[in-house]
């Protein structure tokens, strides 16, 4: 038996690749990933061990993982009382005694982004508490934060229900087929690849059936299904994501071996990276005479920072010919491998939701939605809601033209039965009845009408304001410029605006006019668009207005950098500097009934400010440092008294004053902090 990669050994043992990785770690066998090699001797030993005992070990492993959770639920602790002030992630974490970083990491592993110190809702607090088996009670007085059910979008409630279902039913999760989007530069072979896979892998249609465009199709590889979205490119991908309807699990980035990494390749990569979707690179056209796979790999490294696995990285790169089918089977196997490692799952018997790929008015069927089922089993006769539109499923038709009675997770179908045309890329939910569907739709329409003039704006000022709520802040930018030189100079200049408190994330940068793709990426990523010597085309301008994306264009780079620098400086926490204002001495201590002790003070130098602070020294030792409660000059309340005048002072929470005590007065000044741009950068531009 020769040496094997981890995933190859997992296949032989009929084990999950991730499970085998874990087992190898437990055995002290060092492997980095599923692509790591295991030597021949170790392979033989593992085969001897696991071929006989794998089933028993799995049973024991399951028993071990279930037992602690049972004990955990049985050991109930007293509830933690939560007030309005506790509804910040850092304070809430401290209150429930779970490290904030752990909460952020655990939610990130579930695909949810939390930021340090962010404000959290009561429902999110409950969700976090449930994850760690912490019981909560909430403040119920008039100052407590109360959710406003009348203003809440019912679609948000449906979304939360799915989050809770996933949280509370982890034991019911099962693997589902991955949904794949193919991206890449124009003419690099995206459509050719999709067509080849469809022709060679999709089962023959029913006799008399007509191939139906449902926006996606399924193939079977080694007995497992893969769903491909049939519209190549990143435009639909990002439009769906901007509307919260993420359907893609894996991105295949197609790069031509004779052309290398091109502008749209970079653009597509940035879209996928922004969505945190795993990427497999297919280097296409290797059958051409001028194909250069190594050059293409080098450009993947230098332009995209994607290091192929055979070069020591962790990016799966498969050289293929979509026209001739060379290595396409290997690509499909790699998709299944990544799907296994990503642990793509669903709850098949949960309530139903689906993601709309596209909608249209069909001559025969009326308003239809091409969709992919995400959870549950969609059935003919179900009542469905998609945004502000509802309907009853009259027919489900797959990509082979076959009518289905039901559609399982990851199945692409055309849904017939909507009363009106749903918004493209909306999420479809199944509800109990027509009455419930109508209730939801009416509420959504009412909310949309009310909020029509209050549409969310992704503006620099608003993003920076929201950033104040977090400890580590991030400003996302999309940069467009007229030339490569201008773009590089701009990137270098912005890189100098770095600070430990604010990260600048350049989501995407490219040469050329601002287009619709830029707008949708900005909307999905909550980024602003900065253009240097370029403008937005008409379509992009209209889309930016409807999406609430702010575009700022400049012809002078100094102005762009000054605006960005000023905005970032406004977000920096000011530096607190102590400034001494004066000195005095207590000449007399007066005790006033029901009020406390008042110090009769002679000012020797400078002044005392009522809003400032004081240090009291006795025989050279500090006995008090704090605030001034009241300041009087001849019975009059004043804000300031200067030397050589006398005054009466009451110190906040301190009455142990004595004649002869020396006083040092000071104020705290908040000095705005500055960012520094290296001057030579300006000269280069």
Swiss-Prot record:
Region (G5): 321-323
Superkingdom: Bacteria
InterPro entries tied to this protein: EF-G-like_DII, IF2_II, IF2_N, P-loop_NTPase, Small_GTP-bd, T_Tr_GTP-bd_dom, TF_IF2_bacterial-like, TIF_IF2
tr-type G domain location: 175-352
Originating species: Fervidobacterium nodosum (strain ATCC 35602 / DSM 5306 / Rt17-B1)
Organism lineage string: Bacteria, Thermotogati, Thermotogota, Thermotogae, Thermotogales
Stated name of the protein: Translation initiation factor IF-2
Any one GO MF annotation of this record: translation initiation factor activity
The keyword Acetylation is annotated on this UniProt entry: no
Cellular location(s): Cytoplasm
């Amino acid at each position: 038996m020769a040496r094997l990669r981890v995933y190859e050994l997992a296949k032989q043992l009929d084990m999950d690749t991730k499970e085998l990785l874990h087992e190898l770690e437990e055995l002290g066998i060092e492997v980095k990933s599923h692509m790591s090699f295991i030597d021949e001797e170790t392979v033989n030993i593992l085969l001897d061990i696991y071929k006989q005992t794998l089933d028993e070990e799995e049973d024991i492993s399951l028993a071990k993982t279930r037992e602690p959770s049972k004990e955990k639920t049985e050991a109930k602790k007293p509830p933690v009382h939560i007030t309005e002030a506790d509804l910040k992630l850092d304070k809430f974490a401290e209150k429930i005694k779970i490290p904030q970083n752990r909460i952020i990491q655990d939610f990130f592993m579930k695909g949810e982004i939390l930021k340090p110190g962010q404000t959290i809702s009561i429902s999110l607090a409950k969700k976090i508490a449930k994850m760690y088996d912490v019981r909560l009670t909430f403040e119920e007085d008039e100052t407590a934060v109360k959710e406003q059910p009348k203003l809440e979008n019912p679609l948000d409630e449906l979304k939360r229900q799915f989050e809770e279902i996933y949280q509370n039913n982890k034991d019911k999760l099962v693997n589902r087929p991955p949904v794949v989007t193919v991206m890449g530069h124009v003419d690099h072979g995206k459509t050719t690849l999709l067509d080849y896979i469809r022709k060679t892998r999709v089962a023959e249609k029913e006799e008399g059936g007509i191939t139906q465009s449902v926006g996606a199709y399924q193939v079977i590889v080694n007995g497992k299904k893969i769903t491909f979205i049939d519209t190549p490119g990143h435009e639909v991908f990002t439009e769906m994501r901007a509307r919260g309807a993420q359907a893609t699990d894996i991105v295949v980035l197609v790069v031509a071996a004779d052309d290398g990494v091109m502008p749209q390749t970079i653009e597509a990569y940035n879209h996928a990276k922004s969505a945190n979707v795993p990427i497999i690179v297919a280097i296409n056209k290797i059958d051409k005479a001028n194909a250069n796979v190594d050059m293409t790999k080098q450009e993947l490294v230098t332009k995209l920072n994607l290091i192929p696995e055979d070069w020591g990285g962790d990016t799966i790169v498969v050289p293929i010919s979509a026209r001739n089918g060379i290595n396409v089977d290997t690509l499909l196997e790699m998709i299944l491998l990544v799907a296994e490692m990503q642990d793509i799952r669903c709850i098949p018997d949960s309530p139903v939701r689906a993601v709309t790929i596209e909608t249209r008015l069909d001559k025969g069927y009326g308003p239809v939605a091409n969709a992919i089922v995400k959870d549950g089993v969609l059935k003919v006769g179900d009542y469905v809601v998609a945004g502000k539109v509802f309907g009853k499923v009259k027919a489900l038709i797959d990509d082979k033209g076959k009518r289905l009675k039901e559609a399982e997770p990851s199945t692409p179908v055309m849904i017939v039965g909507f009363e009106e045309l749903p918004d493209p890329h909306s999420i479809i939910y199944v509800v109990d009845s027509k009455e419930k569907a109508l209730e939801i739709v009416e509420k959504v329409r009412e909310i949309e009408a009310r909020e029509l003039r209050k549409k969310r704006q992704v503006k620099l000022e608003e993003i920076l304001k929201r950033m104040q709520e977090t400890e580590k802040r991030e400003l996302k930018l999309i940069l467009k410029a007229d030339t490569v030189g201008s773009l590089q100079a701009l990137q270098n200049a912005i890189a100098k605006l770095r600070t430990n408190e604010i990260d600048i994330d350049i989501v995407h940068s490219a040469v050329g006019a601002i287009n619709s793709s830029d707008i949708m990426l900005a909307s999905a990523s909550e980024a602003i668009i900065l253009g240097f010597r370029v403008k937005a085309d008409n379509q992009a301008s209209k889309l930016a207005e409807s999406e609430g994306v702010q575009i700022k264009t400049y012809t002078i780079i100094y102005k762009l950098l000054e605006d960005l620098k000023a905005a970032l400086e406004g977000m920096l926490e000011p530096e607190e500097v102590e400034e001494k204002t004066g000195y005095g001495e207590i000449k007399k201590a007066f005790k006033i009934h029901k009020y406390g002790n008042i110090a009769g003070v002679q000012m020797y130098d400078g002044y005392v400010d009522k809003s400032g602070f004081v240090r009291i020294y006795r025989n050279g030792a500090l006995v008090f440092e704090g605030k001034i409660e009241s300041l009087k000059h001849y019975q009059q309340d004043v804000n300031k008294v200067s030397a050589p005048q006398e005054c009466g002072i009451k110190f906040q929470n301190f009455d142990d004053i004595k004649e002869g005590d020396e006083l040092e007065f000071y104020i705290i000044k908040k000095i705005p902090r500055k960012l520094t741009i290296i001057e030579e950068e300006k000269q280069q531009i």
